[in-house]
């Protein structure tokens, strides 16, 4: 891995995430979108807990509240985006979801120049709003917006948990919380699907690796060898990679307006990331980059 360029590792992490999403969608007919999200969360949470074995005996009330809040955001983000995938193309859903962290960055900006990126992102939203997906699958768009809100909440809570809890213990506990949150909604369909087709355990085990374990490892390796500014810009390619994964695996094409919207949101994300890094380098306050 040391010979692989860091940008390649970062791109591989994003490709892995979107491939996992596309593979999961191929089995929605067997377990439903919520059942699929539940299986992914259960397998991912159990594997992470076994690897990390979080030490929670001496946690304070504030640490517990932070981990639970992070878990709620994580669970909502996973369930809502999978429900969105069921009715709209992955590329469109991820573009809408990206508006969560992008809006969070823009809300905290203190520079007028970032209004340009806000307008560009708004243009993307408007184009998505008048595109064919929004007209024919309003429910999917709504769930993607909910996922965007959860992603923004996840970022806020992740900063708090990262500062309050050392290592990845907080993440391991939050994954367990996300799993518990999903169980009342997806357990029955997940169990019914696995009983009919036990191979689904292997499929969603692979999804958990592609969507969680492998990207996390690749991102850690990449961040050790590249500036976070460059990493943030590469992360902004997420919607485009999602669209390509949807096209390659699910044969999901995007309408011209949706492609333009994707480009607008991606460009706004790149702009916010670069602007924030320049501001930090000059000692001024700035926005936070769009996270992975």
Whereabouts are the PLM-identified features?
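Membrane-interface interhelical linkers
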Residues: 1-12, 45-69, 107-116, 133-138, ...
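Glycine-/small-residue-enriched transmembrane alpha-helix faces in small-molecule transporters
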Residues: 1-35, 72, 76-80, 123, ...
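Transmembrane alpha-helices of multi-pass small-molecule transport proteins
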Residues: 6, 30-76, 103-104, 150-157, ...
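Hydrophobic residues within alpha-helical transmembrane segments
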Residues: 8, 12, 38-43, 69, ...
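Hydrophobic alpha-helical transmembrane segments of multi-pass membrane transport proteins
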Residues: 11-19, 23, 51, 68-83, ...
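Hydrophobic/aromatic residues within transmembrane alpha-helices
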Residues: 27, 36, 40, 84, ...
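Alpha-helical transmembrane segments of compact multi-pass small-molecule transporters, enriched
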Residues: 42-47, 96-107, 177-181, 234-249, ...
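Hydrophobic transmembrane alpha-helices of multi-pass small-molecule transport proteins
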Residues: 99, 113-132, 245-247, 257-276
């Amino acid at each position: 891995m040391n010979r692989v360029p860091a940008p390649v590792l970062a791109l591989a992490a994003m490709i892995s995430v979107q491939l996992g999403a596309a593979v999961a969608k191929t089995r929605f007919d067997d377990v439903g979108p919520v059942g699929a999200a539940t299986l992914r969360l259960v397998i991912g949470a159990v594997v992470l807990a076994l690897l990390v074995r979080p030490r929670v005996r001496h946690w304070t009330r504030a640490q517990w509240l932070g981990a639970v809040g992070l878990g709620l955001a994580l669970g909502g983000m996973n369930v809502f985006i999978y429900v969105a995938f069921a009715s709209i193309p992955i590329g469109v859903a991820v573009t809408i979801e990206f508006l969560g962290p992008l809006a969070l960055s823009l809300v905290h900006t203190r520079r007028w120049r970032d209004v340009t990126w806000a307008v560009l992102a708004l243009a993307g939203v408007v184009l998505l709003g008048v595109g064919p997906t929004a007209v024919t699958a309003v429910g999917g768009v709504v769930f993607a917006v909910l996922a965007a809100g959860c992603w923004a909440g996840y970022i806020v809570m992740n900063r708090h948990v990262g500062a309050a809890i050392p290592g990845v213990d907080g993440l391991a506990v939050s994954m367990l919380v996300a799993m518990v949150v999903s169980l009342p909604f997806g357990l029955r369909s997940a169990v019914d699907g696995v009983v009919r087709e036990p191979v689904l355990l292997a499929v969603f085990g692979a999804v958990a690796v592609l969507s969680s374990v492998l990207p996390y490892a690749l991102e850690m390796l990449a961040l050790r060898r590249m500036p976070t500014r460059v990493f943030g810009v590469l992360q902004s390619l997420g919607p485009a990679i999602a669209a390509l994964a949807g096209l390659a695996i699910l044969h999901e094409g995007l309408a011209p307006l949706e492609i333009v919207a994707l480009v607008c949101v991606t460009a706004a994300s790149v702009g916010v990331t670069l602007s924030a890094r320049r501001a930090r380098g000059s000692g001024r306050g700035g926005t936070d980059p769009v996270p992975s």
